[in-house]
Amino acid sequence: PVFSYSGTTISFSVVWKGRSYLLKCSLREEQENTLSWRRVAAYLQRIRSAFLVGYYYLSGEMLVFNDRGAAGYIDVVLMEYPDHMQPLDEFLEKACMEGDKERIRKLLTEFCQMAVWLINDNLVHGAIRASNVMIDKDCSVHLVNYEYMQMPRSDAPDYESIRDADNVMVANLALGIKAVASDPAAFRYLRGNAIFRFPVVRSPLLPMFADVAREAGCEPVLRIVEMLSCSNHTLHGRLALSEALRKLSGDRTELGVDLSVK
């Protein structure tokens, strides 16, 4: 397609200097959105994390016409979107169909390392889901789409209330990746579950995961399940979650139960 849209944002696929990007603009010129995009782009230029992609704010870059024929220049964002990467769910579907446990285990390590960095850096992505987690050929993990991102800001009165916004999502996704690393056939069942489809929702499978983790002696999974079971859309206890994810990144415990029969 020539373009796609989500909410009030429209995106065009472009190639610039041999690299693939998404060029994004807002359907509504709102000063608050423009300022937010500018701040995010400036902040990401400073931190340069391997878990993020290039994100550039370009002022007055695109000439647009309204339905009356009047023209004007608007600001846009240029976000790197390498065509050799795959969204998390597509990557997992292929790896699970091939039964490639080693690649899934490597992905789990990379994903947990990304999640630990995100939590400890006090950065809030704001929209973590499978389609916004891109996987490279070497299993490295890259977050994309930063329109809802919040930077660490001590002067923002609402920052404390949103700083834990990503925790439920990264915990659910880590749990799902760990499950299919043990049983790749389980992905066909878990893909439609909240764990992958809408990871902000508490999955009804958590009690089953607790039993599996307890039986296998997998302490990181059990700890994450306990934290998710006590959460209500927001999982507090950032340091505890970061530590559990750090341990999970190197955990090789087989969950030992065929999840496809549950």
Predicted regions and their residues:
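Catalytic-loop of the protein kinase fold
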Residues: 115-136
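Conserved structural core of kinase catalytic domains
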Residues: 53-106
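ATP-binding glycine-rich loop module of kinase domains
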Residues: 7-58, 262
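Activation of the activation-loop gatekeeper triad in protein kinase-fold domains
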Residues: 145-150
